[in-house]
Structures are given as C-alpha cells and as structure tokens.
C-alpha cells in the first residue's frame, strides 16, 4: 500500500542505504537492463537470482498487489519461485512473458489467497514444496471460511501437484490469539535434495 506505514518505513530505509552508497534498481530497470541493472544476479557460485517480467511493472494495476516483484532463484537444476502478492492478472502475464520451469519450491502467492495461485501458473511450475506465510483460519479479512488464508481454492489448486504445504501460523480461537503452526520454515538445499525444518512442527 503506497500510503502505509510499512511502505514509508521501507522507503526511509531504502533511501538511507542509497545515500550510504548502495544502488537501487526497479524490477523494470533490471528486466530492461538499463542504467547498470541486470536481469540476473549471482548470489553465490551456483545460485542465481533472476528478475522475472510481468506487465504491471509498467502498466497501471487496479490492485496494488499486482505491482509485486517476481523472482526465480536457481541453484543448479533446482528452481525456487517467489511472486509476492501477485494476483491472477499478474500471474497470467508472468506465465505468458517468461519461460517458467518446474519448481521445487514455491512461496504461495498472496498468503494463499483465492485470487492468486491460479491453475494457469501452477500447471506450469508444478511445485513440489509450497510455503505459505499466513495465519491459517483467521477471520481478519473475511468471514467466509472458504476464503480465509490459505483459501480452499488455494488448497484445491495446489493439491494435484503436492501435499507438502507448510503454513507459518494458525488460529483456532481469536480470543486465545495466534499460535505457531509450522512456525519458522527453513528450506535448505545441498544442490540435490531439499530439506524442510520448522521451528513449530514439520506437519504437512
């Protein structure tokens, strides 16, 4: 949200880093490789961060979530996809504009929202492991149980590809507050095998 306190804090910290000598690029600058920006950045000897294209980097969106920056991390033959809060129109553009590979890891879009994680995207990436950052069962945004994060539509769309879905937090009773589900989800890879370790539990 362009007017939120979180956005303001981000901009303050970003501007401070730039003033201290860091270089800031937008996703579109990276995709177009302008002013020294690159589409791909080597994070280590065998790990690369790739900026993916989606049309709302340069078009006006009706939903601010569609301005999300999308990344593909590659480690040898392993692929890890991050789409932020990208909605269905953005996902459609993402699939159309990029040669997306099958992905060993997918960070579930928009907290498992029914307006993201579309069959069109999932049928291409066919994720093996999905991690969702949300409070499962919370009615903060809706009273409709089917649409509470992670939504039933999300579960139905992911189910053909994997049952390895991890969720950070859960709530059964608002009065009792939130409790850890899987908790902090740590995915590690030796380049061959992915291992998931969670601070709460390893249930899927």
What are these regions (language model features)?
Residues 1-204:
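Non-globular, low-confidence helical/coil segments that flank catalytic cores
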């Amino acid at each position: 949200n362009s007017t939120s306190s979180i956005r303001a804090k981000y901009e303050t910290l970003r501007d401070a880093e730039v003033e201290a000598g860091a270089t800031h690029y937008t996703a579109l600058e990276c995709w177009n490789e302008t002013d020294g920006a690159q589409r791909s950045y080597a994070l280590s000897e065998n790990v690369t961060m790739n900026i993916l294209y989606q049309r709302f980097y340069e078009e006006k969106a009706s939903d601010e979530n569609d301005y999300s920056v999308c990344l593909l991390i590659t480690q040898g033959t392993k692929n890890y996809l991050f789409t932020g809060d990208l909605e269905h129109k953005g996902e459609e553009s993402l699939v159309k504009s990029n040669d997306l590979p099958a992905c060993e890891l997918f960070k579930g879009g928009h907290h498992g929202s029914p307006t993201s994680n579309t069959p069109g995207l999932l049928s291409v990436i066919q994720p093996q492991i999905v991690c969702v950052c949300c409070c499962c069962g919370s009615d903060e945004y809706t009273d409709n149980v089917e649409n509470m994060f992670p939504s039933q539509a999300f579960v139905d769309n992911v189910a053909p590809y994997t049952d390895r879905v991890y969720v950070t937090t859960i709530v059964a009773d608002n009065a009792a507050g939130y409790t850890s589900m899987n908790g902090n989800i740590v995915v590690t890879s030796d380049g061959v095998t992915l291992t998931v370790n969670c601070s709460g539990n390893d249930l899927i």
